[in-house]
Amino acid sequence: MKKLYYTILATAAALTTASCVDLLNTAPENQIASENMWTTPELALKGMNGLYETFYNRKQSNGTQVRSENLDGLNKYGIEALGFCTDYYANNYPIYLLYNQAKRANDWQLAHEWRFCYTIVHAANDAVTNLHKAGLDAPTYERYLCEARFLRAWAYSRLNKFWQGVPVYLEPISNEQCTRTQESAEYVWREVVLPDLKYCIDNASFPDNTLGESNFGRPSKGAAYALRGMAYMWLKEWQTAANDFEQVGQCGYDLWRGEYIDFFSPDNERDNEMSFAIQYDEESGYCDNIQQAVGARDTYGGWDEVKPASDFVDYYQNDDGTEFKWSQVTGLENWDQLTPRQRAVFFCRDGLKSNAKLASQ
């Protein structure tokens, strides 16, 4: 009798669970859920636009990205400060990570970079896996697939530059499944980044460039060649990298012909040099706010925290290719006789150009 009682209870519980599933609307028609995100062309377009959401800094009014509560979107401070060409200075504790030798694994800058890149990875994986359900025509489907795989390659490329090998996920997973161990840096380049970019480059539905489109600045074959060329540089395959960089020009991209300081403005967002563009305006608080940290005190209250690294500056040569020497500059003939301490206080301004409108604010 007791065994029959347990059997009846188990059957009743199963029926109750099944009834709940039948009654529960797991794909509501009045909102976008994971079950219906990729079910129509309209929703697929929204999903593709959503892949770029992670790049945006939504906290412009909270100040620059120097505290964890303000850090949002693409971390330009981190990538600039950790690069060879930049020295970063700040007496603000959250920024110490960027120029201290010892890095804590739980530091918020490291955590943000990890979370930022893997958010793009997992969103791209979702698109790659589910786009076929949206009923798209073949060219649109292939282009969307290329965009998603390009963004995944971009995110893994950035992760690999920072950590030299990371866990690899190429399919949608739950939080509980994020338990894979680190792959080698070479594995990430050869088995993840390069295959994704090859798919983009070989795909006939992926445009050479997006300069003339309404969605200009989106990924293209030219951008894929550029990113793949950088991957080959990390693999020290120099000639292969050079070949890819040559192809960037064949896709319709070119170098900026004007003054460098004039380049970064909304007017030039369709310039041929813009292969995968980030919106920028020199007035802080709109498209960006990194200029508040990069600019000197005479440019709209800049904080003077990001500076050219001295090692990087020493790589410069004269425009004819000969070695640059400070002692050959008029007025600095005795440069070689100065002590390092005396040189440290010397600052040379040559052709200073400032925005009068911003400087007056």
Predicted feature residues:
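Short acidic-aromatic linear motifs embedded in glycine-rich loops, typified by GG[WY][YF]DAGD(H)
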Residues: V21-E147, Y156, K161-F162, V166-P172, ...
